[in-house]
Amino acid sequence: MQLLKDRIRAEGRVLPGNIIKVDGFLNHRVDTKLMREMAKEFGRLFDLTGLTAVLTVEASGIALGAICAEEFGVPLIFAKKAKSDNIEGGLYQSEIFSYTHKKKVTLL
């Protein structure tokens, strides 16, 4: 997607460990128009037949995930990085590596 490439080239910074810092439009400050265009592009690129929800990771993924879920007409589910006391019932969990924090994280 050229619009996203242009924004990364214009505003992104490469940090040690090859992490691309895009907090000016993707995580700390969110450009919702760009997010909407990204959601539309995902809808164009992927077969959404049978899609029942959008799953993303808590924090940075929520903004884009919410706009994608709205665009696709399905609910948003986000995986938490820590169990809270108000979650009941069985949980799915998966271990991932966080490149930002340089450690393994268990998502619930």
Where are these regions (language model features)?
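A generic local structural motif
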Residues: 40-42, 63-64, 103-108
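Short glycine-rich phosphate-binding loop at a beta-alpha junction
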Residues: 50-58
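Short Gly/Thr/Asp-enriched flexible loops that form oxyanion-binding sites at enzyme active sites
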Residues: 63-72
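Short, catalytically relevant binding-site loops at active-site mouths
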Residues: 60-63, 83-85
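Short, glycine/charge-rich flexible loops or terminal/linker lids adjacent to PRPP-binding catalytic cores
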Residues: 74-108
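N-terminal leader/targeting helix
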Residues: 45, 59-60
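Active-site-facing substrate-recognition patch
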Residues: 1-50
